[in-house]
Amino acid sequence: MTVEWLAEQLKEHNIELTETQKQQFQTYYRLLVEWNEKMNLTSITDEHDVYLKHFYDSIAPSFYFDFNQPISICDVGAGAGFPSIPLKIMFPQLKVTIVDSLNKRIQFLNHLASELQLQDVSFIHDRAETFGKGVYRESYDVVTARAVARLSVLSELCLPLIKKGGQFVALKSSKGEEELEEAKFAISVLGGNVTETHTFKLPEDAGERQMFIIDKKRQTPKKYPRKPGTPNKTPLLEK
């Protein structure tokens, strides 16, 4: 059973999966595959691959960052809910908001949350650039993003949402260090400071991951984020 494989992997990190959590992951997988037939949620559909490359990969940041506390998390561009929904299953006290620009994905997430009986979750159909200018600006303890865009771009989308004293947890593949070097200027301009870098391998040689923890030291200047599309077209880079 694939969920038992996940339980064994997590046990190595002193994390015990309850029966309820096991059932939630099984339901998550079933709904992901069902909905993926009518909309593009993921290219990964093999059961074991989903448990490894989506579920385990989403939970792995908790080996290095304490999510087991009552904090508010915003997940930018989470797609089918990664990493925040697996983290919510593991740590039910988290208050989770997902922002995604595609309404179909929001519909899936609403159905998923209902079926998993998740409390304190909200899903918002918006561009991160406009969301970061609104009432939720600088209101979250933690913002997560998983390989949505280059780190210089992600920083402009995510750092404005974090309250001073909070953290940006950026999850990248093995080329993350190059992106970090390029993004240092943007991170500084936006009020952040890189405090931790973690590199780890997924089980079964499924690839290397890098995780950056960026502390929000100062308020983000009001002009950021710039209008939709601009961060991607012209990232904040040192001239």
From Swiss-Prot:
Keyword field: Cytoplasm, Methyltransferase, rRNA processing, S-adenosyl-L-methionine, Transferase
Residues that bind S-adenosyl-L-methionine: 77, 82, 128-129, 146
Gene3D superfamilies found in the cross-reference section: Vaccinia Virus protein VP39
MF annotations from Gene Ontology: rRNA (guanine-N7-)-methyltransferase activity
Subcellular location as annotated: Cytoplasm
Region (Disordered): 214-239
InterPro entries given in the database record: rRNA_ssu_MeTfrase_G, SAM-dependent_MTases_sf
Main localization category: cytoplasm
Keyword Hydrolase tagged: no
A GO term from the CC aspect: cytosol
Enzyme Commission number(s) from the entry: 2.1.1.-
HAMAP family, A to Z: 16SrRNA_methyltr_G (MF_00074)
NCBIfam families reported in the protein's UniProt record: rsmG_gidB
Family: Belongs to the methyltransferase superfamily. RNA methyltransferase RsmG family.
Function statement: Specifically methylates the N7 position of guanine in position 535 of 16S rRNA.
Name listed for the protein in its UniProt record: Ribosomal RNA small subunit methyltransferase G
